[in-house]
């Protein structure tokens, strides 16, 4: 199922989870810039942005939000492969959405079109054959309101990238989700993935079996993603 179809139905539930527990995925967002830190006054395109959650991690920069699905906000809706209503930006961020993109090569090429020369793409997503991919496709897919979750996962070292993009980093990084309790973790996942007709224990068992977590002073879910940094080496035409 496409990103547009999924979040047209599940966007409100996802946004509720992100806004009720806004700290849970701090590590996931912070890891985006761990290898190439942000400067000041950079223009950053967050796509797909859904509820615009990136802005609080980029307080000295301007974040432009676009999305692929009309759901919970007034953010402009665009195609992954078409012209976007923005001037070339310094950086583009795509977090945890690439596994819903059908033509990754075209998407990368389009992102390159919207970068300044030497601009950076920061992409992070679930790895091929990882425990998290199995959690999403098997448990979430069996219990979400949209009826399935069949992600397009990749070994990012084997992906064909446009020749105008230089691979700077490809790295699996831990980005644990942090909760106050098991109950909070189950509630968060219930809304984030719009899980229906499942009890907290079923969610916790699935998280334990697929992903793993520790429950001591904090409840820490062992989330991790592959982080990819790409740099545009496409020469921009000189101004006339």
Descriptions of predicted regions:
Residues 37-43:
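Short helix-loop-beta connector
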Residues 105-120:
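A short glycine-rich, Lys/Arg-flanked "PGG" loop and its adjoining helix->strand segment in the class I
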Residues 21-25, 49-53, 152-157, 163-240:
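Conserved Class I S-adenosyl-L-methionine
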Residues 45-84:
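Class I SAM-dependent methyltransferase SAM/SAH-binding core
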Residues 82-92:
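A short acidic, Gly/Pro-enriched loop at the edge of an enzyme's catalytic core
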Residues 1-37, 53-54, 122-149:
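Conserved class I S-adenosyl-L-methionine
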Residues 90-105:
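A short SAM/SAH-binding and catalytic strip from SAM-dependent methyltransferases
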